[in-house]
């Protein structure tokens, strides 16, 4: 029996070595990040109403295996609907009108089996960012940003994630909102790898996005699309449930990165089921490491 055990030792050692290598590979798994304006629950949307879309929205998030999701325009009932359908995700955020449940959330979601939230919070895009429900500059609406420091359970490494939705009317609100976001990313995220998701209501050549990505600014971010090794899908993300002609559609939904994150893949997921859309925006997905 002792001889048999000694003969098996090399094979056991090899098997354990392979297991160790496999574990090392697993800890190097990319992180899939999605930004998704899900369109607020508007009864006037007819067949595009949330009641007809909520199952498909949840399935899309799960199908694309998103580890982190930044959502915009989520009303409280929509938050509850998604929480019920995506129990493997934790959500962070509050309603922008009162800091509780009123108004749209810019909710952050993360997979509970992949990440732990070490810290999180939110602030308003206004001159008084800590005042709940405050409206900034010339903005038409209250605007909020939600952030978290997430620790990867596979590696122990941390990253800073922020999700927001800039104003659709106020020029100054977008400009000053971006300044505030960049300052907060630096203040809260420091030297951590940074991911910023959101609907910026601005096209890539706009002053707003140039402000975000200006390399002369030490706080600048990088548009993930511009550095991805593989880019997939159209160059637009807003289509208004398909009503905008292709040549007039625009890319206003972004994922930005900073501090050494490598963007492996970037995709705009312009899918439909027949004539049915997930939202009036497309989800955007990146894979980073």
Located regions from the model:
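Structured beta-strand-rich core segments of catalytic domains in phosphoester-bond hydrolases
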Residues: 68-158, 268
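Positively charged n-region of N-terminal signal peptides that target proteins for export
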Residues: 1-4, 18
